[in-house]
């Protein structure tokens, strides 16, 4: 990296977020997102009227629920809107939806990225979380906040129910079911209800690392 900084500044300036100063513990940050861009992205991402939900980060802003995005292609209008649960279209088999639900794989990568950024910025970068709340925290604490929200998909609430079980008594209270979690493919962006394949032990199984990392 030092060679690129000294000999290829044209490349380094495009891809190294901060060449003028080093970050926490004298680190350099290799990232496509500069500090200004990161702040702007997080302002949207941490807005509870847009991406931030009780159970993680939505795959599309809730803003588009009442304001669908439309575009005209060769006189044909195509529209996409916020759909928090199962797909309302038969496209791609109709059994998957990236227009609103919470996907654990994406949320996990977001958490990992925030922790990497925190390794560079440390406590110096404070972001409002949630947006509009007046509460500011560093990126490490924001990552922890997202991890806790993800855990709320599976943790029992005061009534003994898990959001992912969607109020099904058998799954929440039956002695043969209540302690055995289903690893759903994705989750409703508003309620946390488990959707898609219920045996998605791959990326949804990442919740185990989330729980481990947060204690």
PLM features: residue spans?
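Acidic, mature catalytic/reactive cores of soluble proteins
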Residues: 1-215
């Amino acid at each position: 990296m030092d060679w690129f900084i000294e000999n290829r500044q044209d490349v380094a300036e495009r891809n190294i977020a901060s060449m003028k100063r080093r970050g926490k513990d004298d680190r350099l940050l290799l990232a496509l997102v500069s500090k200004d861009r990161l702040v702007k992205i997080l302002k949207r991402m941490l807005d509870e009227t847009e991406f931030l939900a009780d159970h993680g980060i939505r795959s599309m802003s809730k803003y588009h629920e009442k304001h669908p995005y439309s575009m005209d292609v060769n006189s044909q209008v195509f529209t996409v809107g916020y759909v928090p649960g199962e797909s309302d279209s038969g496209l791609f088999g109709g059994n998957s939806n990236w227009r609103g639900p919470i996907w654990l794989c994406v949320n996990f990568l977001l958490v990992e990225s925030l922790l990497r950024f925190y390794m560079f910025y440390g406590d110096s970068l404070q972001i409002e979380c949630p947006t509009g709340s007046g509460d500011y925290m560093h990126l490490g604490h924001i990552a922890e906040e997202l991890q806790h929200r993800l855990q709320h998909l599976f943790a029992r609430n005061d009534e003994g129910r898990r959001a992912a079980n969607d109020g099904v008594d058998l799954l929440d209270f039956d002695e043969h079911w209540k302690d055995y979690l289903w690893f759903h493919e994705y989750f409703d962006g508003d309620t946390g209800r488990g959707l898609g394949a219920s045996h998605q032990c791959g990326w949804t199984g990442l919740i185990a690392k989330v729980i481990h990392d947060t204690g």
